[in-house]
């Protein structure tokens, strides 16, 4: 099974420069918890990924005002990325944990050769053949 077969095509993205408050409001409105961060909505070049939990732990939890936090400053840059043609059977996805955290952060962003976001796989642990590596 290829990434293009299971990804959410043309996912919601947020542009660098958006505030954590704006992203949190978008997440609430769209009922999503993770979103790719891109350079701008037109080009959609991937910069990182931000989750609702990241906003809490990397912005609010550190005493910052989410209205003043630029989302790219708190985005994760270690989210796995693949091409649409990537075969997922046997794909090893690293378990991403913060120190002292037991919450698995498993997501995959699908990009093209120019790093443009094409898709998003929000729950790869549910995709047959993907291995969550310890």
Predicted regions and their residues:
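Short beta->alpha transition motifs characteristic of CBS
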Residues: 32, 36, 45-61, 102-112, ...
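Bateman (tandem CBS) regulatory domains
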Residues: 1-12, 54, 68-79
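Methionine-biased hydrophobic packing positions in alpha-helices, especially
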Residues: 1, 7, 27, 75, ...
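The conserved cystathionine-beta-synthase
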Residues: 13-32, 38-39, 81-105, 110-112, ...
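Regulatory sensory and allosteric helical modules in signal-transduction proteins
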Residues: 57-61, 77-84
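Short beta-to-alpha loop/turn elements within the nucleotide-binding domains of ABC transporters
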Residues: 1, 18, 50, 69, ...
